[in-house]
Amino acid sequence: MADVAKLCDELLALTILEAKELNDLLEEKGIKAAAAVAVAGPAGGGDAPAAEEKDEFDVVLTGAGDKKINVIKEVRAITGLGLKEAKDLVEGAPKAVKEAASKTEAEEIKAKLEAAGASVELK
């Protein structure tokens, strides 16, 4: 067991160049790095894996509706864009208003835009 721990410490101490050389030597011996990834799969029953919940969302404005001016004002407040940029974003729908927002932030932005009369999607 001590030999394995020592080997582990030595592997962790390798520089990137040394790790690349080790990888090349292992490939010459027929051991591919991708093979280890293919072997590691979900264990157990035949059930489909549970869908992972996203933690980042893009808030996409899909339409301005009848109250375009209110939507432009809300887009300006959310993004900090100037009047022309906000107007171009609203008129160029579908466009992302906010990218990589947290779930709560994305839902708040969606609620604000929908209250202003816009149609919004979270992606």
Swiss-Prot record:
Family matches, as CDD domains: Ribosomal_L7_L12
Keyword Ribosomal protein: yes
Gene3D superfamilies: 3.30.1390.10, Single helix bin
Superkingdom of the source species: Bacteria
InterPro entries assigned: Ribosomal_bL12, Ribosomal_bL12_C, Ribosomal_bL12_C/ClpS-like, Ribosomal_bL12_oligo, Ribosomal_bL12_oligo_N_sf
Record GO cellular component, one term: cytosolic large ribosomal subunit
Keywords: Ribonucleoprotein, Ribosomal protein
Gene Ontology BP terms: translation
GO MF entry, a single one: mRNA binding
Signal sequence interval, chain numbering: none
SUPFAM superfamilies: ClpS-like, Ribosomal protein L7/12, oligomerisation (N-terminal) domain
Family of this protein: Belongs to the bacterial ribosomal protein bL12 family.
Role, per record: Forms part of the ribosomal stalk which helps the ribosome interact with GTP-bound translation factors. Is thus essential for accurate translation.
Record note on quaternary structure: Homodimer. Part of the ribosomal stalk of the 50S ribosomal subunit. Forms a multimeric L10(L12)X complex, where L10 forms an elongated spine to which 2 to 4 L12 dimers bind in a sequential fashion. Binds GTP-bound translation factors.
Protein name (database record): Large ribosomal subunit protein bL12
Organism ancestry: Bacteria, Pseudomonadati, Pseudomonadota, Alphaproteobacteria, Maricaulales
